[in-house]
Design a protein with these regions (language model features):
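Alpha-helical transmembrane segments of multi-pass membrane proteins
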Residues: 1-162
């Protein structure tokens, strides 16, 4: 357990997780539009797969029993590498040029890039909530989800308008 003065750091980390995860989803949608278009039959499954992977991340994070900060740091580093390499325009273009039909390329992109990102980042809130044991469970998770969702909102808004 961290001292009470570390709470702002924990909330900053879950804010970054939220910003990064929804930001990655927005960037992924922008990257696949040239290959698949922007209709609801593209965006809805992308959002759905992302949410499913996020749910699996929450489930995985809930089972973590120790090494909380080391695991979150590792997940952030892997997610950063996946974001940098996997969401780069050249990578997406290569996936869609090399794999046919486009639906299969889309599924490979989702399975290899966006879903692993969501799964890794989704573990953050349940893992870091363990470090807030001095609070009521509802209070700790409520504040963590508040900061994560605020980050998600700002990540989706800033990266979609930018």
């Amino acid at each position: 357990m961290l001292n009470p003065h570390s709470r702002p750091l924990l909330f900053a980390l879950v804010f970054i997780e939220g910003f990064s995860s929804l930001g990655a989803e927005v960037i992924a949608l922008r990257q696949i539009i040239p290959h698949l278009g922007s209709s609801i039959v593209v965006t809805a499954p992308t959002i759905g797969f992302f949410l499913l992977a996020l749910a699996f991340g929450y489930h995985t994070g809930a089972k973590v029993a120790d090494n909380y900060l080391a695991l979150v740091a590792r997940n952030f580093l892997i997610a950063a590498a996946l974001t940098g390499a996997g969401l780069a325009g050249i990578t997406v273009d290569i996936i869609f040029a090399a794999i046919n039909p486009p639906l299969l390329a889309y599924l490979v992109f989702m399975a290899a890039v966006l879903c692993p990102l969501a799964w890794l980042l989704g573990q953050t809130v349940p893992i870091l909530t363990n470090l807030m044991q001095h609070q009521r469970t509802g209070e700790a998770s409520g504040y963590a989800l508040y900061w994560s969702t605020l980050g998600s909102f700002l990540g989706s808004l800033s990266l979609s308008l930018g």
